[in-house]
């Protein structure tokens, strides 16, 4: 019997795949557990339209991520941090600080998607990398300034 998997099933396949299994396995386990449905003409057509909609949705997300990447590349963020007279920071600038600076200019990115190559412990200009989508990453340029200075 051919079934369409609704959930990932170990040693059988991933959700959305059409697989052939024995009748008893399908009728007594997969279908009652909600892990699969029978593969009829109607369900196969529904699966195809669902896959097309999902592909369109992913492409829209990818396009918006690329547009956001172009917007971010043109920015130079200002990050305020407490610093001594020699320019050394009290603490470090983290991905969370960069995410807050992006949020202040209207761009919201989760701090876990921002990576710094090395800890930022001095005043100056730096770059971080933000992953906006599975294949869209962007360099975020930011300048660390001492608190109290106006730009």
Swiss-Prot record:
Biological process per Gene Ontology, one example term: translation
Keyword RNA-binding: yes
MF terms in GO: rRNA binding; structural constituent of ribosome
Disulfide bridge positions per record: none
SUPFAM superfamilies tied to this protein: L9 N-domain-like, Ribosomal protein L9 C-domain
Family matches, as InterPro entries: Ribosomal_bL9, Ribosomal_bL9/RNase_H1_N, Ribosomal_bL9_bac/chp, Ribosomal_bL9_C, Ribosomal_bL9_C_sf, Ribosomal_bL9_N, Ribosomal_bL9_N_sf
GO CC list: ribonucleoprotein complex; ribosome
Entry keyword set: Ribonucleoprotein, Ribosomal protein, RNA-binding, rRNA-binding
UniProt cross-references to Pfam families, sorted A to Z: Ribosomal_L9_C, Ribosomal_L9_N
Family: Belongs to the bacterial ribosomal protein bL9 family.
NCBIfam families in alphabetical order: L9
Purpose: Binds to the 23S rRNA.
Stated name of the protein: Large ribosomal subunit protein bL9
Organism this protein belongs to: Chlorobium luteolum (strain DSM 273 / BCRC 81028 / 2530)
Name of the gene this protein is made from: rplI
């Amino acid at each position: 019997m051919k079934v369409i998997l609704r959930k990932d099933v170990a040693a059988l396949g991933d959700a959305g795949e059409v697989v052939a299994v024995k009748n008893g396995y399908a009728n007594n386990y997969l279908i009652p557990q909600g892990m699969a449905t029978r593969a009829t003409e109607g369900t196969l057509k529904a699966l195809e339209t669902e896959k097309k909609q999902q592909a369109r949705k992913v492409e829209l997300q990818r396009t918006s991520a690329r547009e956001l990447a172009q917007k971010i590349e043109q920015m130079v963020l200002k990050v305020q941090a407490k610093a001594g007279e020699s320019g050394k920071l009290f603490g470090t600038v983290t991905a969370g600080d960069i995410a807050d600076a992006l949020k202040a200019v209207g761009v919201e990115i989760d701090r876990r998607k921002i990576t710094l190559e090395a800890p930022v412990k001095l005043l100056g200009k730096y770059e971080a990398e933000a992953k906006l989508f599975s294949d869209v990453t962007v360099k975020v340029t930011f300048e660390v300034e001492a608190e109290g200075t106006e730009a």
